[in-house]
A protein has these predicted regions:
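Short alpha-helical elements
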Residues: 1-205
Length: 205
């Protein structure tokens, strides 16, 4: 958290929220014997059109990709409840005037009401017969950012091959990835490197 706060983008007034699968095992025997049973559960990954056994990493980031809050939860845990918990349980995120950008999975009247009460404006896609919501033109580029952050964690930081077999082990290994991403963003932002702040190309050796 201290390193994230040292990044210039920490104070950005726009947040992006999303979750991504963290698989913890594939074989039936692993599921039966794993110390993660009860925390890890079966869930569905829409982007890969398949079920998985494991957790979901919930992230709130800035547009630069800087993680400002995270949570590891069971694969079926409600994304909206988790997002509210991440914000309400972290005093540093009590920032009236923030804007939170989310996908259609975060649609729920009570979710938006709680955000509004906290002074946070929700931007999400217009669904069905809803009255057109504002700022729809910004959704696509910012959705690409959060998806790019998830891809960085998976492709370059091996999130899906974390190798954790116990709760402390999984938490430590996921935190390693988030810390590595945060450190790269801090270095890129404070050294004025050209290009994306979340780029890890310089550190690929």
């Amino acid at each position: 958290a201290a390193l994230a706060r040292a990044c210039p983008s920490w104070n950005d007034d726009l947040w992006l929220v999303d979750s991504t699968p963290v698989e913890c095992g594939r074989s039936r025997e692993t599921v039966k014997r794993s110390d993660l049973a009860g925390w890890a559960t079966y869930g569905y990954c829409a982007s890969h059109s398949r079920f998985f056994w494991g957790l979901r990493l919930h992230l709130i980031t800035t547009p630069s990709g800087l993680p400002v809050a995270y949570a590891l939860a069971g694969a079926k845990t409600d994304e909206r409840d988790t997002a509210l918990d991440m914000i309400s349980l972290n005093p540093e995120l009590h920032r009236p005037g923030q804007t939170l950008m989310a996908d259609k999975g975060y649609r729920r009247a009570s979710f938006e009401t709680e955000l509004t009460d906290a002074g946070i404006t929700l931007i999400r896609p217009t669904l069905g017969k809803e009255k057109p919501r504002p700022h729809q033109q910004f959704l696509r580029p910012f959705r690409q950012i959060i998806e790019s952050v998830n891809q960085t964690l998976k492709a370059q930081l091996d999130l899906e091959r974390h190798g954790g077999r116990t709760k402390p082990g999984v938490c430590a290994r996921i935190l390693q990835r988030l810390l590595a991403l945060t450190a790269a963003i801090w270095h890129n932002e404070t050294s004025d490197r050209p290009g994306s702040a979340r780029s890890l190309t310089t550190y690929d050796h």
